C-alpha cells in the first residue's frame, strides 16, 4: 500500500515553512527537504574510487559513507527538524545578543527594585530567575525535536521544562518524605488541610443502577477522561494499540485496587462508562480527527502574499495547526521481532505513566483538581507528543540508530517518578500483594502480545484482500466483454458490442 501524500506545494512564509508535524517516517521528511544537510552530510565528500566496469558503480567505501550520511541526517531530522523556505526572517533569526541584553536588564531591574524583607518571597524569586534563565538557554541551545509549529522556540522551551522537571525529580529523590511534604506546603499552604480519606468506601451498592446515579458519575473528570483518550488516539493513531491500553488499564485498576481505594469501581462504571463511553468514544473521535486531517489538502501561502487583513489574521491562526498530516503504520506483516517487542514496550510504558499519576497524587496527598496535578497532566501530555514521534521513527525507520533526545528524557522522567513513588510510599507498598503484581505483569505481557499479533494478522488480511482484488477483476473482464449467447441480442447489437 502506498502512503498517502497530503502536502501540496512548498510553504513560503516563515510560518508556513514549518515542517510536517505528523508521525510520518523520517524517510519522508528527508525527501521533503533534500537541501538540508547534517554536520556529517555537509562535510566535503571524499573522492571515491570507481570500478573499471562501464557501469561506474560506487565502491563499497562510498556506499558505507552514504549510509552513514543517511543515518546522521535521519537523526537530525527527528531530533532537530529544520525550517526551510523562510520568508519572515526576523522570527527565525537567533537574536542571541538582543536576547542576552534584554534578559540581563530585566533581571537587574527586578533584583534592585523588589522588596527583600520576606525570606520566602526571596527564595521564590530566586527560583523563578533560575527557571527563566534556564529556559532562555534552552531556546538558544536545545533541539526543537521533530515539530516546528507554531515555532521551534515553543518546543525548545517545552524541552527545557522537561529537563527542569527531570532535575527536580532527581533532587526530590534524595529528600525524605517530611522534607518533600514541607516543600509542597511551602508552594501551597492549603495542602496542610488535605488528607486522603482511607476510610471512604468506593464501588458500593453496585446493584443500584439508576439514571441519577449514572449522571452523577458523568462529572468534569469523565469529560477529562474522554478528552484524554481522544488526545491519546491523536498521538498513537492505531486502533489495536489504543484498545490494548484501554483494556489493560481496567485490569491495572483491579490489580492495584488494594493499594489505591479509588480504583474500586462498580462493574457498570468500569465497563460501560469507562471502557465503552469515555474510552471508546474518545478513541473514535481522536481517530476521526486524524482521518479528517489526512484527507485535507495542505497548501500554504506566504502571509506576505495575502492582501486582506482578515486573510492575514486567518493565516496567523492557522500557524497553530499542523503543516501536513500523514498516516502512520506501527506494524506491518513483515515486522521484525524487535519491532513487535518495541510496540509491546510502548503499551507497558504507557501503563506505568498512568500509574505514576495516581500514585504521586495518593502518596503526597493532593486533591485531584490541584494545580500541581493538573499542571503535570498537561505538561506530560504535551511532552509525550514529540517523544512518541521520535519513538515511532526509532522503531519503524531502519536508518534511525538511536532514540531522540526528547524520548530519552521522557523515559528518564517516567522511571524517576516510579522510583520516587516506591521510595516514599514504603508503608503503602508494604501492603502489596505479590501475587497480584505477578499476575498483573503476566496479563500485561499476554494481552500486549495478543493485541499486537491481532493487529499484524488484520494487516495481513487487508493486504491479501487488496492484492486479490485486481486478479479477480482481470478474470471477470474477459467474461463480460465476450460475445453474448446466441439468441439474446440482435445481430446489429452483437456487431456494435464486438
From Swiss-Prot:
Region of interest (Disordered), ranges: 1-65, 465-498
Entry GO terms, CC: endomembrane system; endoplasmic reticulum membrane
Cytoplasmic side: 1-92, 144-153, 261-266, 361-367, 424-436
Segments traversing the membrane: 93-113, 123-143, 154-174, 240-260, 267-287, 340-360, 368-388, 403-423, 437-457
InterPro entries xref list: PSS
Localisation per UniProt entry: Endoplasmic reticulum membrane
Pathway: Phospholipid metabolism; phosphatidylserine biosynthesis
Topological type in the membrane: Multi-pass membrane protein
Top enzyme class: transferase
Ranges per topology, Lumenal: 114-122, 175-239, 288-339, 389-402, 458-498
GO biological process assignments: phosphatidylserine biosynthetic process
Outcome of gene disruption: Lethal at the first instar larval stage. RNAi-mediated knockdown in salivary glands reduces phosphatidylserine (PS) levels and depletes Akt1 from the plasma membrane contributing to cell growth defects probably by affecting the insulin pathway; causes a shift from phospholipid synthesis to neutral lipid synthesis, which results in ectopic lipid accumulation in third instar larval salivary glands; reduces mitochondrial PS levels thereby impairing mitochondrial protein import and mitochondrial integrity.
Domain of life: Eukaryota
Glycosylation site positions: 205
GO MF terms, alphabetically ordered: L-serine-phosphatidylcholine phosphatidyltransferase activity; L-serine-phosphatidylethanolamine phosphatidyltransferase activity; phosphotransferase activity, for other substituted phosphate groups
Bias (Polar residues): 7-25
Biased composition (Low complexity): 478-490
EC identifiers of the protein: 2.7.8.29
Catalytic activity: a 1,2-diacyl-sn-glycero-3-phosphoethanolamine + L-serine = a 1,2-diacyl-sn-glycero-3-phospho-L-serine + ethanolamine
Keywords per UniProt: Endoplasmic reticulum, Glycoprotein, Lipid metabolism, Membrane, Phospholipid metabolism, Transferase, Transmembrane, Transmembrane helix
Function summary: Catalyzes a base-exchange reaction in which the polar head group of phosphatidylethanolamine (PE) is replaced by L-serine.
Family: Belongs to the phosphatidyl serine synthase family.
Protein name: Phosphatidylserine synthase
Organism (species): Drosophila melanogaster (Fruit fly)
Amino acid at each position: 500500500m502506498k502512503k498517502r501524500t497530503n502536502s501540496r506545494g512548498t510553504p513560503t512564509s516563515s510560518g508556513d515553512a514549518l515542517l510536517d508535524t505528523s508521525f510520518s517516517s523520517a524517510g519522508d521528511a528527508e525527501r521533503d527537504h533534500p537541501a538540508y544537510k547534517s554536520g556529517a552530510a555537509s562535510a566535503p565528500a571524499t573522492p571515491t574510487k570507481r570500478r573499471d566496469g562501464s557501469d561506474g558503480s560506487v565502491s563499497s567505501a562510498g556506499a558505507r559513507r552514504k549510509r552513514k550520511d543517511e543515518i546522521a541526517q535521519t537523526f537530525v531530522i527527528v531530533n532537530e527538524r529544520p525550517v526551510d523556505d523562510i520568508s519572515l526572517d526576523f522570527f527565525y533569526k537567533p537574536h542571541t545578543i538582543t536576547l542576552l541584553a534584554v534578559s540581563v536588564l530585566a533581571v537587574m531591574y527586578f533584583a534592585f527594585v523588589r522588596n527583600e524583607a520576606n525570606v520566602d518571597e526571596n527564595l521564590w524569586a530566586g527560583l523563578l530567575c533560575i527557571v527563566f534563565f534556564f529556559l532562555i538557554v534552552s531556546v538558544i541551545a536545545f533541539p526543537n525535536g521533530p515539530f516546528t509549529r507554531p515555532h521551534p522556540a515553543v518546543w525548545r522551551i517545552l524541552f527545557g521544562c522537561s529537563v527542569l522537571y527531570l532535575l527536580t525529580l532527581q533532587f526530590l529523590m534524595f529528600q525524605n518524605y517530611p522534607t518533600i511534604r514541607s516543600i509542597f506546603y511551602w508552594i501551597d499552604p492549603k495542602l496542610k488541610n488535605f488528607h486522603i480519606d482511607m476510610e471512604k468506601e468506593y464501588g458500593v451498592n453496585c446493584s443500584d443502577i439508576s439514571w441519577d446515579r449514572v449522571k452523577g458519575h458523568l462529572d468534569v473528570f469523565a469529560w477529562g477522561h474522554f478528552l484524554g483518550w481522544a488526545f491519546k488516539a491523536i498521538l498513537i493513531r492505531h486502533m489495536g494499540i489504543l484498545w490494548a491500553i484501554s483494556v489493560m488499564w481496567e485490569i491495572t485498576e483491579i490489580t492495584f485496587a488494594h493499594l489505591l481505594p479509588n480504583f474500586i469501581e462498580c462493574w457498570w462504571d468500569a465497563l460501560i462508562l469507562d471502557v465503552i463511553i469515555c474510552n471508546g468514544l474518545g478513541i473514535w473521535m481522536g481517530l476521526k480527527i486524524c482521518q479528517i486531517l489526512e484527507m485535507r489538502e495542505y497548501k500554504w501561502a506566504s502571509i506576505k502574499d495575502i492582501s486582506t487583513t482578515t486573510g492575514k489574521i486567518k493565516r496567523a491562526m492557522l500557524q497553530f495547526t499542523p503543516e501536513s498530516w500523514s498516516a502512520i503504520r506501527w506494524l506491518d506483516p513483515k515486522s521484525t521481532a524487535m519491532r513487535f517487542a518495541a510496540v509491546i514496550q510502548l503499551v507497558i510504558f504507557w501503563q506505568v505513566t498512568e500509574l505514576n499519576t495516581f500514585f504521586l497524587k495518593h502518596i503526597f496527598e493532593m486533591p485531584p483538581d490541584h494545580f500541581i496535578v493538573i499542571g503535570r497532566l498537561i505538561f506530560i501530555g504535551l511532552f509525550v507528543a514529540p517523544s512518541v514521534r521520535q519513538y515511532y521513527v526509532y522503531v519503524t525507520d531502519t536508518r534511525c540508530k538511536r532514540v531522540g533526545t526528547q524520548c530519552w528524557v521522557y523515559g528518564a522522567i517516567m522511571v524517576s517518578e516510579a522510583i520516587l513513588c516506591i521510595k516514599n510510599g514504603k508503608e503503602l507498598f508494604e501492603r502489596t500483594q505479590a501475587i497480584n503484581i505477578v499476575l498483573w505483569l503476566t496479563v500485561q505481557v499476554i494481552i500486549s502480545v495478543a493485541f499486537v499479533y491481532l493487529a499484524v494478522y488484520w494487516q495481513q488480511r487487508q493486504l491479501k484482500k487488496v492484492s486479490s482484488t485486481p486478479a479477480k477483476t482481470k478474470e471477470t473482464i474477459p467474461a463480460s466483454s465476450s460475445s453474448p449467447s446466441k439468441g439474446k441480442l440482435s445481430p446489429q447489437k452483437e456487431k456494435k458490442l464486438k
